[in-house]
Amino acid sequence: MRAKTTSRHHNVDEQEIAKFEAVASRWWDLEGEFKPLHRINPLRLNYILQRSGGIFEKKVLDVGCGGGILAESMAREGAQVTGLDMGYEPLQVARLHALETGVKLEYVQETVENHAQQHPQHYDVVTCMEMLEHVPDPASVVRACAQLVKPGGHVFFSTINRNTKSWLMAVVGAEYLLKMVPKGTHDAKKFIRPSELIGWVDQTPLLERHIIGLHYNPITDHFKLGRNVDVNYMVHTQRDSE
């Protein structure tokens, strides 16, 4: 039975949800629309493991988990993972895949703001990957993530910088020329400059610890992490120990 989603939060964009609902059945197709997410997942996972000091037996929340690519990989590392998303179909795909692979984790259809009200300072690690640019109020998500993590805990964000280069790479290149992701996946106006993200972080108990770029070379078809944050980037933050 389909979960009721008629009561929506102010920070949910129905059109954004619909984009991912439409392609949810292909989330675990390694050659499909989500191939880039599968390709970069090891880089993201290793960054999270290194910067957090490991997640074995830690309580981890993946905000905007979609079909569960990152969430499932963190559960395989021994973490107690909860995946959070507002898309019904992606969560159904995530649950089914977890059953098929035998990976134990929990998926919840709920906004991060509501989850934060119910579970303050509950998690050791919170991840929010490629989600901020898909909501009306990304600062609200940052505040909720800060509320959810324990003192001394870690919060990781990833998003796309807002400039001409990122528009050319993430929209023109990835969507129209290389067809790496479906057309219309991104709205360049919603991209977020690092200074904006750090500004929101600074208004919470979170402290910026590290920032790194994620680069794609179309000639070698290779992804890597590096210092340049012109396009995709990740930010590691840590909640102040109280």
UniProtKB/Swiss-Prot annotation:
Q: Which GO terms describe its biological process?
A: methylation
Q: Which cysteines are joined by disulfide bonds?
A: none
- Reactions accelerated catalytically: a 3-demethylubiquinol + S-adenosyl-L-methionine = a ubiquinol + S-adenosyl-L-homocysteine + H(+); a 3-(all-trans-polyprenyl)benzene-1,2-diol + S-adenosyl-L-methionine = a 2-methoxy-6-(all-trans-polyprenyl)phenol + S-adenosyl-L-homocysteine + H(+)
Can you provide one Gene Ontology molecular function annotated for this UniProt record? methyltransferase activity
Coiled coil ranges (UniProt) are: none
Sites binding S-adenosyl-L-methionine sit at R44, G64, D85, M129
Q: What is its EC number?
A: 2.1.1.222, 2.1.1.64
Which key words tag this protein in UniProt?
Methyltransferase, S-adenosyl-L-methionine, Transferase, Ubiquinone biosynthesis
Q: What class of enzyme is it?
A: transferase
The organism's superkingdom is given as Bacteria
Which InterPro entries does this UniProt record tie to the protein? Answer: SAM-dependent_MTases_sf, UbiG_MeTrfase
Pathway assigned in UniProt = Cofactor biosynthesis; ubiquinone biosynthesis
What exactly does this protein do? O-methyltransferase that catalyzes the 2 O-methylation steps in the ubiquinone biosynthetic pathway.
Family per UniProt?
Answer: Belongs to the methyltransferase superfamily. UbiG/COQ3 family.
Q: What is this protein called?
A: Ubiquinone biosynthesis O-methyltransferase
What lineage does UniProt assign to this protein's organism? Bacteria, Pseudomonadati, Pseudomonadota, Gammaproteobacteria, Enterobacterales
Gene from which this protein is expressed: ubiG
